[in-house]
C-alpha cells in the first residue's frame, strides 16, 4: 500500500463496504435524505435515542412516536424518511400509529447505516468513486494505524474515503453539514502525515462553502484542499465533478506554499 512508506498502514475498514447490488438502494436513499436534510437530522436523533435503549444485537425497535433528547426537546421521526428506509430495504415491518412506531432493521449492516447520521455521505462518495471506474482503488472508512512507527496516538485515525489514483493517495473527508476550519485542519494534518506533498485532500461538505467562497473555503484553497459542497452533492453530475476535481487538482502550485 502507498501508506507503508510513512509508517502508517491500512488496518481495515470501520464500516462494512456495501455490496454492489445495494448501490442503487443506497443512492436512492441518499436522494431522500439529502433532499430532506433537516428532517433527517431529527429522524436520526430519534433513531439514535431509541436504538440506545436496546442491545447492539437487537434488530427490533419499538417506541413511542416522541423521544426526548438530552436537552429536554422532543423529537418525532419523519414518516416519509421511515417509509423510504423500508421501501429501499434497510428496515422492514414498519408500523406507525399516532402514539407508537416499530420496525426491524433488515440486517446488522443496515442497522449500522440507519443509526448513523453522516455515513450516507460517505457511502454516496464511495459508490460514485467506485462506479466511475476512474481510479485504481477505493476504500470506505479506512482506519489507519499510526502506531506502526509513531509514538503519538492520533485521535483522527479514520479517513472517510481513500482513493488511489495512479498510486497517488487521495483523502476525502465527508461532513453532512457545512465545512468548518476544524474539518479543514484535520484533513490537512492527515494528508500531510500520510501522503506528504504527493497526495490530495478533498472535503465534501453539505454547506454552501464553494458557492459562497466562505472563509473556510478560502483557507482550504490556501492549503490545496478542494471543497465540494451541497450544490455539487445535489447535482446530477456529482460523479463527473468528483472525478474532475481529483484528476485536475493542481499539485505543482502546492509545492511552494508554506504550511
Language-model features: where?
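Intrinsically disordered, low-complexity Ser/Thr/Pro/Gly-rich regulatory segments
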Residues: 1-259
Amino acid at each position: 500500500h502507498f501508506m507503508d512508506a510513512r509508517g502508517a498502514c491500512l488496518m481495515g475498514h470501520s464500516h462494512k463496504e456495501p455490496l454492489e447490488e445495494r448501490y442503487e438502494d443506497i443512492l436512492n436513499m441518499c436522494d431522500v435524505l439529502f433532499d430532506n436534510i433537516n428532517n433527517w437530522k431529527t429522524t436520526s436523533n430519534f433513531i439514535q435515542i431509541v436504538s440506545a435503549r436496546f442491545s447492539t444485537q437487537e434488530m427490533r425497535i419499538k417506541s413511542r412516536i416522541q423521544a426526548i433528547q438530552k436537552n429536554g426537546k422532543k423529537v418525532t421521526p419523519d414518516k416519509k424518511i421511515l417509509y423510504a428506509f423500508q421501501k429501499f430495504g434497510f428496515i422492514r415491518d414498519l408500523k406507525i400509529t399516532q402514539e407508537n412506531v416499530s420496525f426491524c432493521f433488515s440486517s446488522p449492516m443496515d442497522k449500522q447505516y440507519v443509526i448513523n447520521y453522516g455515513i450516507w455521505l460517505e457511502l454516496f462518495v464511495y459508490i460514485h468513486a467506485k462506479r466511475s471506474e476512474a481510479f485504481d482503488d477505493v476504500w470506505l472508512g479506512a482506519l489507519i494505524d499510526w502506531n506502526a512507527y509513531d509514538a503519538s496516538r492520533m485521535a483522527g485515525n479514520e479517513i472517510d474515503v481513500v482513493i488511489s489514483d495512479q498510486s497517488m493517495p487521495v483523502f476525502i473527508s465527508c461532513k453532512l453539514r457545512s465545512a468548518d476550519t476544524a474539518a479543514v485542519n484535520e484533513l490537512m494534518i492527515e494528508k500531510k502525515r500520510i501522503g506528504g506533498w504527493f497526495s490530495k485532500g478533498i472535503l465534501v461538505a453539505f454547506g454552501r462553502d464553494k458557492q459562497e467562497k466562505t472563509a473556510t473555503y478560502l483557507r482550504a484553497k490556501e492549503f490545496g484542499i478542494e471543497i465540494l459542497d451541497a450544490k455539487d452533492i445535489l447535482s446530477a453530475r456529482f460523479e463527473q465533478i468528483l472525478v474532475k476535481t481529483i484528476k485536475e487538482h493542481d499539485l505543482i502550485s502546492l509545492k511552494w506554499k508554506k504550511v
